[in-house]
Amino acid sequence: MLKPLGDRVVIEQVETEEKTASGIVLPDTAKEKPQEGRVVAVGTGRVTENGEKIALEVKEGDSVIFSKYAGTEVKYDGKEYLILRESDILAIIG
């Protein structure tokens, strides 16, 4: 499994089927990049300038909303993930 370092988080993006107002299903090439996902792994936390380690607020299993162009897309074990910093996460859902 992927183990992110520091304040990074591994996200499994939630794919939703997009339809127009008239009910036409959009192909993958026309879809917006998803901004919602599930946290599958978290790093150990960030370190402040004076060496203090601050734990991350998100945890494995959290559903989150993140910045549209945040992170780095990676493929691991046949699945696609997004690795981003906790500061790129805008909200925890639920």
From Swiss-Prot:
What GO molecular-function term can you cite, just one?
ATP binding
Task: Give the location in the cell.
Answer: Cytoplasm
Q: Which GO terms describe its cellular component?
A: cytoplasm
Q: What is the protein's major site of localization? A: cytoplasm
Q: List the disulfide bonds.
A: none
Q: Does the keyword Cytoplasm apply?
A: yes
Cite the entry's keywords alphabetically.
Chaperone, Cytoplasm, Stress response
Per its record, what triggers expression of this gene product? By heat shock.
Pfam families linked to this entry:
Cpn10
Instruction: Tell whether Cytoplasm is among the UniProt keywords.
Output: yes
Which family does the entry's similarity section mention?
Belongs to the GroES chaperonin family.
Subunit details: Heptamer of 7 subunits arranged in a ring. Interacts with the chaperonin GroEL.
Function noted in UniProt: Together with the chaperonin GroEL, plays an essential role in assisting protein folding. The GroEL-GroES system forms a nano-cage that allows encapsulation of the non-native substrate proteins and provides a physical environment optimized to promote and accelerate protein folding. GroES binds to the apical surface of the GroEL ring, thereby capping the opening of the GroEL channel.
Write down what this protein is called: Co-chaperonin GroES
Q: Which organism is it from?
A: Halalkalibacterium halodurans (strain ATCC BAA-125 / DSM 18197 / FERM 7344 / JCM 9153 / C-125)
